[in-house]
């Protein structure tokens, strides 16, 4: 098959791990290594700084928009520091690059919950007009004018960025990539949208006159902004990177292992999965840079298994009883009955397993970095995001007891989420026209969390921060007692996909089945590597 062409290039250490049990999650963030608490006295000036990709940027439903509901912003609110936490904003046309939720609501307002065949031409026209408006706003309108800030953002995250991007990309490289935009009616996508998004994250000219600061440089500057007598300028630094070193295998349904030029900003663009060795080499560079940042506590997050995301849905039943994998993975709007491997894009079950195995090796490397740092006396911690998502994986484990590893236990959702009907799960979101009937943890792009999903991430990180001795405060400044919990009631109210999903997103996902071949939504919203 076409997508098996590079199967011979599968790294030897990945092949050696086939048929092994999945990696067991780390349950002790300190890795059973005691370290003297990283600093005493009042908290440093910058209580929270994050370095990451789309999962930290606040991306959902194909766009970065509600950055005030990213998991870093949620944590900052619970810290009692929300009014000081600086993050980029994308206020127009549902954000960048294309807000699928807003598009579906536009179509629902015009055509109702069901799109009849005779309405298809008008619906196509309406959708293209919406996309043209977004293109005009960000390329030639108010969105084309970047903000001038007087300080460095605390959320230093850019969707689509992998380890190499964080090591090397700057405002200058992003500006150099921008071209004179063209108003193309057929290819309606905001040109260079990733660079435009990054320019709202990176320090502006008023802070960085020559535009040569990387995200790591920016974090280092924050770490150097120390009050008298303090060793650190940052209290907690969260590093959550690596998903984009494997995610394109799922978004493109194609496995191309990294090779020559993988450290080059342009040369790496043809690869969809990094070999574990290449990942380790770049991770070592990243960890060295993080060691230079003056942060009291550092939390590293592991890479989630991207094949669990519902954008790639397993079809044709599990390969055998007790297997974690399906024979094929394709788009969620293609039914088992309709799927044809000769016609439809897909990954094979073996490819999905190989990608997961590579991610397990990435996570072993991240764990090793934390372990060595703790042995050196640094107050570093591990947040095992991969294990968290594994415990929420509906089709892989929850609905198939035979596939569960011996260590597996279901993740206990917070009481406010358990009270929802139906209880949120990792299926693709669906509604009956009036209410949510399935899913709830993943947004409409099938990869990124909903607002409540980001709340779960925030809660796990808050628990680690409390273990590190970080104080969370009420609005009046008083210290919050343990356990410190996220205000999920607030997040539910803000999460429109939970409390009022688009009425045209019915269980068959017919509107997406129409929109994807017609509008190329996945390509427009998730082929967003910085290249």
For each predicted feature, which ranges?
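Helix-enriched interaction subdomains in cytosolic or periplasmic regions
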Residues: 1-23
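Conserved SGNH/GDSL esterase-like catalytic core that processes O-acyl groups on lipids
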Residues: 17, 21-25, 58-282, 478-531
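Catalytic nucleophile-elbow at a beta strand-turn-alpha helix junction centered on a G-D-S/GDSL motif
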Residues: 42-62
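Mobile gating loops/cap/lid regions near enzyme active sites that modulate substrate access
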Residues: 305, 311-357, 367-447
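Histidine-centered active-site loop/cap adjacent to the catalytic His
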Residues: 48, 73-75, 235-237, 362, ...
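Sec-exported extracytoplasmic/periplasmic mature domains
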Residues: 56, 60, 76-81, 224, ...
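A structural motif corresponding to the C-terminal end of an alpha-helix
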Residues: 222-234, 281-299, 344-384
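Active-site-proximal beta-strand/loop segments in catalytic clefts of secreted hydrolases
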Residues: 51-53, 239-244, 301-305, 385-388, ...
């Amino acid at each position: 098959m076409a997508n098996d062409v590079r199967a011979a290039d599968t790294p030897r250490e990945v092949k050696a791990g086939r048929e092994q049990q999945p990696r067991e999650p780390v349950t002790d963030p300190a890795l059973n290594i005691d370290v003297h608490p990283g600093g005493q006295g009042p908290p440093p000036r910058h209580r929270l700084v994050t370095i990451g990709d789309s999962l930290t940027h606040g991306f959902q439903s194909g766009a970065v928009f509600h950055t005030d509901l990213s998991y870093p912003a949620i944590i900052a609110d619970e810290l009692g520091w929300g009014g000081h936490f600086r993050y980029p904003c994308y206020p127009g046309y549902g954000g960048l690059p294309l807000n699928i939720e807003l598009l579906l609501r536009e179509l629902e307002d015009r055509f109702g919950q069901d799109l009849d065949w005779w309405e298809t031409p008008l619906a196509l026209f309406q959708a293209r007009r919406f996309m043209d408006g977004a293109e005009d706003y960000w390329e030639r309108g108010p969105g084309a004018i970047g903000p001038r800030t007087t300080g460095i953002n605390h959320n230093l995250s850019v969707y689509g960025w992998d380890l190499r991007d964080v090591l090397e990309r700057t405002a200058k490289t992003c500006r150099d990539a921008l071209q004179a935009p063209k108003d193309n009616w057929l290819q309606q996508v905001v040109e260079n949208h990733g660079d435009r998004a990054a320019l709202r994250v990176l320090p502006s000219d008023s802070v960085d006159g020559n535009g040569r600061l990387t995200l790591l440089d920016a974090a280092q500057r924050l770490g150097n902004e120390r009050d008298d007598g303090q060793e650190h300028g940052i209290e907690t630094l969260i590093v959550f990177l690596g998903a984009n070193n494997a995610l394109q295998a799922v978004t493109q349904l194609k496995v191309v292992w990294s090779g020559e030029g993988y450290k080059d900003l342009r040369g790496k663009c043809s690869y969809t999965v990094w070999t574990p060795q290449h990942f380790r080499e770049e991770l070592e560079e990243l960890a060295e840079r993080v060691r230079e940042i003056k942060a009291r506590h550092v939390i590293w997050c592991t890479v989630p298994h991207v094949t669990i995301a519902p954008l790639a849905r397993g079809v044709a039943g599990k390969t055998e009883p007790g297997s974690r994998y399906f024979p094929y993975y394709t788009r969620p709007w293609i039914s088992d009955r309709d799927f044809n491997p000769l016609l439809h894009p897909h990954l094979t079950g073996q490819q999905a397993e190989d990608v997961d195995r590579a991610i397990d090796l990435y996570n072993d490397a991240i764990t090793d970095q934390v372990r060595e740092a703790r042995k050196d006396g640094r107050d570093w911690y591990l947040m095992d995001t991969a294990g968290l998502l594994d415990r929420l994986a509906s089709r892989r484990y929850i609905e198939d007891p035979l596939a569960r590893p011996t260590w597996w236990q279901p993740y206990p959702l917070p009481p406010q989420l358990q009270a929802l009907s139906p209880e949120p799960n990792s299926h693709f979101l669906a509604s009956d026209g009036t209410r949510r009937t399935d899913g709830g943890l993943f947004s409409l792009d099938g990869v990124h969390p909903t607002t409540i999903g980001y709340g779960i991430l925030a809660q796990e990180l808050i628990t680690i921060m409390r273990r590190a001795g970080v104080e969370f405060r009420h609005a009046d400044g008083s210290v919050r007692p343990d356990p410190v919990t996220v205000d999920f009631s607030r997040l539910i109210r803000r999460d429109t996909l939970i409390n009022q999903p688009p009425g045209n997103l019915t269980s068959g996902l017919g509107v997406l089945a129409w929109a994807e071949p017609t509008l190329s939504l996945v390509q427009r919203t998730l082929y967003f590597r910085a290249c």
